């Protein structure tokens, strides 16, 4: 009889947890609890400052976020937070937080960030930190941003560059890469269409995507990952930590922000469809940007199971710069997991921290 009562109580608890997850998920969200200050603002951009309680290194670590996401991925859980990890490893941490872009911002493009917003933010960070140089971190699209910033802006004041999950040889990125390669081949058969698409004459209003569409698209690109996430929740409804983590990650994925039309033009029609970075050069407007201009220490990482940007798409960067200090590593997890999973925190975060400490100036 007691066994039956316990079983009923367990099922009731599971149903209660499922109900909370479905109808009151905001009460379960754990992200962005680490305190920070806003040290500067530029247009819609804010610079967050996470002071180290035991600063040991002169150069601060600067995270540049990808577009479309909120900042939760950098401070996901109180017990597994990237910014908190580096704070307590002796680094002052800065996070470049982009604005809540909407249709009015549809003309923003790569150059708006690599030749305007990022240089301005780095200047403010250098002043605030009283450090001539910084360490710069970019994941996903932000990895492309920081690579192109370092290649284009001289001097760039970057001592150490960390690039994670960013497509350099886009055609090598599994099924997604092959699809873009095939589409590009089809476009090339019609010169009128090719000129229309690649000459930036497509109205930005046509290719601007909303936050909702981006959230749906992210799930469609990796349906297997989304399905397994839901399955794990249903199998672990009696596990409070997994319930909180699922709600926190769901909140992050569901609250995406618009991609400006100009960004989609540069990312999809240029980086993904034409694949210029494979050859170490990209043309943006009237500028030719060459990756060989990068000379700082470089750490490149790729998710072992990344279904969006495969390791084969990331790795070619090791051959394209003039850096004399290049490290490549595989990271546990997929495109999100490489940033946030427990396996990444256990295996990759210590490696990344050691790499950075060895190349930073001890105070």
What are the language-model segments listed below?
Residues 2-3, 127, 131, 147-259:
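Alpha/beta-hydrolase-fold enzymes
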Residues 34-102:
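Short, surface-exposed "cap/lid" segments of acyl-processing enzymes
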Residues 108-128:
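Alpha/beta-hydrolase active-site loop
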Residues 136-138, 164, 301:
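Short beta-strand immediately N-terminal to the catalytic nucleophile in serine-hydrolase-like folds
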Residues 137-146:
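Gly/Ala-rich beta-loop-alpha elbow adjacent to hydrolase catalytic centers
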Residues 294, 300-302, 306:
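Short beta-strand/loop motif that positions the catalytic acidic residue
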Residues 296, 310-319:
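Short alpha-helix in the alpha/beta-hydrolase fold that links the catalytic acid
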Residues 308, 333-347:
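Catalytic histidine-centered segment of alpha/beta-hydrolase-like enzymes
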């Amino acid at each position: 009889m007691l066994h039956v009562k316990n079983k009923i109580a367990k099922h009731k608890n599971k149903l209660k947890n499922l109900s909370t997850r479905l109808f009151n998920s905001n009460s379960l969200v754990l992200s962005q609890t680490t305190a920070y200050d806003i040290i500067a603002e530029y247009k819609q951009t804010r610079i967050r400052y996470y002071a180290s309680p035991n600063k040991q290194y002169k150069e601060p670590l600067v995270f540049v976020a990808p577009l479309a996401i909120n900042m939760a991925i950098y401070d996901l859980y109180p017990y597994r937070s990237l910014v908190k990890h580096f704070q307590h490893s002796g680094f002052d941490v800065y996070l470049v937080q982009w604005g809540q872009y909407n249709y009015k911002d549809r003309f923003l493009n790569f150059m708006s960030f690599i030749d305007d917003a990022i240089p301005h933010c780095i200047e403010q960070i250098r002043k605030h930190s009283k450090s001539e140089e910084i360490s710069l971190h970019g994941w996903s699209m932000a990895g492309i941003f920081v690579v192109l910033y370092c290649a284009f802006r001289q001097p760039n004041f970057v001592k150490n560059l960390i690039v994670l999950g960013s497509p350099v040889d886009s055609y090598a990125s599994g099924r997604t890469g092959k699809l873009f390669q095939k589409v590009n081949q089809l476009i090339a058969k019609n010169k009128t269409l090719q000129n229309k698409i690649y000459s930036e004459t497509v109205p930005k209003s046509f290719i601007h995507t909303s936050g909702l569409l981006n959230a749906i698209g992210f799930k469609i690109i990796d349906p297997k990952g989304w399905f397994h996430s839901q399955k794990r929740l249903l199998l672990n409804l009696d596990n409070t930590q997994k319930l909180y983590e699922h709600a926190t990650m769901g909140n992050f994925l569901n609250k995406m922000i618009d991609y400006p039309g100009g960004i989609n033009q540069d990312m999809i029609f240029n980086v993904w469809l034409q694949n210029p970075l494979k050859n170490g050069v990209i043309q943006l407007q009237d500028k030719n940007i060459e990756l060989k201009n990068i000379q700082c220490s470089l750490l490149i990482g790729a998710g072992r199971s990344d279904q969006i940007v495969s390791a084969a798409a990331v790795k070619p960067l090791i051959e394209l710069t003039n850096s004399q200090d290049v490290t490549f590593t595989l990271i546990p997890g997929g495109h999100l997991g490489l940033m946030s999973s427990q396996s990444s925190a256990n295996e990759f975060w210590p490696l990344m921290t050691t790499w950075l400490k060895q190349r930073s100036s001890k105070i």
